[in-house]
A protein has these predicted regions:
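Conserved glycine-rich beta-strand-loop-beta hairpin in the small C-terminal domain of fold type I
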Residues: 368-378, 389-403
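N-terminal basic, amphipathic alpha-helical segments
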Residues: 1-134, 332, 339-342, 351, ...
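Conserved core segment of the aminotransferase class I/II
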Residues: 129, 305-371
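Conserved core of the PLP fold type I
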Residues: 140-277, 289-290, 295-298, 302-303, ...
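Short beta-strand "wing" residues that participate in macromolecule-binding interfaces
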Residues: 61-63, 170, 424
């Protein structure tokens, strides 16, 4: 099944033997990557690659922040010898991108500042929020037992005021409070599309968005997006003339993973173009408040005159993800009546913080810190990466997109880097066909410490070494 001449193939085979006829039973947790490295005297890259193979074959699954487990359905009721076990290829295999993401999620608890799209938790106003939450719970015990929050709650009014700052003429009753997760995408995809239809997205795109589209049985039309200037409007216009598109899902301001920003003229043109074709737009504006400049950039929604733009954002991402509060502005509010909302105590805590006069100063400090971090990463990459590595100046967000020459394999680079406990996100996570595997994304939401600088320098040396091998490969072939 696997090439046992490779170290990772042999390791995958040995683990398969243990799953099929050895000590590992359905539901059992596999030893940690560190333990497997010690046991088999193998690098973390070799062990991780072997686990990729087993997961692709449907034999194991990963649970975020927990580890790898033997899949229940892989086994028959009785133990069978290896020869009688159904071939793993008969099991539904996960796409390569998803398997890779699941494997990387095992590192969630590890200190990997460049891997996950996270912001330094020290930048969040935890003390102020804790104080407000304690006061709210003491003076309003009904929040602890649950009370119904109507469309004219303090949080609705605060968000309506912020909408006017963003150039959006919405009112408290237009706003739906949501959990800060992908439930908004799920609800809007269910409402606006049918399985088998096509949704246009910017490419590169967040892996979670690609997963949602896949789970809804939707086809993906990838529109190229420049890491600095955003969506290619000419390509979108061409695609709309040739393809039947049920909906679009775009971000105008600092989208993950590139961090570009569209001009206001470009945003207006996109909204007008979609209105001409009657195509709804799902706008994810969760990063719009993370701008480095003085003025908050306008979202697509600010140019919407037809109601075709379905807007959502995540406020808790600005103050701490533990609150898990987002909101949507859409004419499909009735579709959200069946989904869960954040606890009332959390909602009133956030609205009190926003009304206290502390919110805007906090946002300024947060933006200044992220802008400083971004500059630190830019300087470190310029200093340590080879000149062939092209990074892009962004004006918001907390990630850096880096392009390497076509043909460069950043997934192979990741496996090499994991041997030194260095991790990043390879480009193939952010597209459907692996065409971005010459790119990578670094999280810049954490400061560049001495350790991070050392890791960037080591990663730059690995890139230079891999580029040298790429250049020598044609000459080797010519001599052969």
């Amino acid at each position: 099944m696997w090439d046992r001449s490779t170290r990772y193939g042999e390791l995958a085979f040995q683990l398969q033997e243990e799953i099929c006829s050895g000590p590992l039973s359905p539901g059992d947790k596999l030893p940690s990557i560190r333990a497997l490295c010690a046991r088999f005297q193998a690098s973390s890259a070799t062990v991780t690659h072997a686990l990729y193979l087993l997961e692709d074959a449907g034999m194991i699954s990963v649970r975020p922040r927990s580890g790898f487990y033997v899949r229940e359905r892989f086994h028959a009721v009785e133990r069978r010898p290896p020869a009688r076990v159904p071939e793993p290829c008969l099991q539904p295999a996960l796409p390569a991108q998803r398997a890779l993401l699941r494997s990387l999620e095992v590192l969630a608890a590890a200190d990997q500042p460049m891997l996950f799209a996270r912001i330094n938790p020290e930048l969040y106003p935890a003390v102020a929020l804790q104080r407000i939450m304690t006061e709210q719970a003491r003076h309003n015990p009904a929040f602890l037992t649950g009370c119904l929050i109507g469309p004219d709650s303090p949080l609705h009014r605060q968000l309506a005021r912020r909408g006017r700052i963003m150039g959006c003429d919405w009112h408290a009753e237009d706003i739906t409070i949501t959990l800060a997760n992908y439930e908004v995408y799920r609800t809007l995809f269910r409402s606006l599309t049918q399985p088998g239809q096509t949704v246009a997205i910017a490419s590169p795109a967040p892996m979670r968005l690609l997963e949602e589209l896949d789970e809804h049985g939707l086809k993906v039309l990838e529109i190229p997006s420049h890491p600095e200037h955003g969506l290619s409007i000419d390509t979108l216009e061409f695609a709309l003339r040739r393809e039947k598109v049920a909906a679009c899902a775009f971000s105008a301001n600092f989208p993950h993973p590139t961090g570009g920003q569209m001009s206001d003229a470009g945003k207006r043109r996109v909204v007008e173009l979609l209105a001409e074709h009657g195509v709804p737009l799902i706008e994810d504006d969760r990063n719009g408040d993370l701008h480095f400049g003085e003025k908050r950039p306008l979202p697509f929604k600010a140019f919407d005159r037809t109601g075709l733009v379905h807007y959502f954002s995540d406020v808790s991402g600005l103050v701490g993800h533990g609150l898990s509060i987002g909101f949507a502005v859409t004419n499909l509010r009735h579709e959200f009546e069946r989904i869960a909302q954040p606890p009332e105590l959390f909602q009133y805590t956030l609205s009190s913080f926003m009304a206290s006069g502390l919110f805007e100063p906090h946002l300024r400090r947060l933006r200044q810190a992220l802008a400083s971090y971004s500059s630190q990463y830019q300087a470190a990459v310029r200093a340590h990466f080879p000149r062939e590595a092209r990074s892009f100046a962004v004006s918001g967000g907390h990630w850096m997109w880096i392009e390497l020459p076509r043909g460069f394999d950043t997934t192979a680079l990741l496996r090499r880097a994991l041997q030194d406990d260095i991790a990043f996100s390879p480009g193939q996570l952010f597209c459907t066909d692996g065409s971005l595997n010459h790119c990578l994304r670094l999280n810049t939401g954490m400061p560049v410490t001495e350790t991070v600088e050392r890791d960037i320098a080591a990663l730059g040396a690995m890139i230079a070494e891999q580029l040298t091998l790429m250049r020598s490969a044609p000459r080797e072939a010519d001599r052969a």
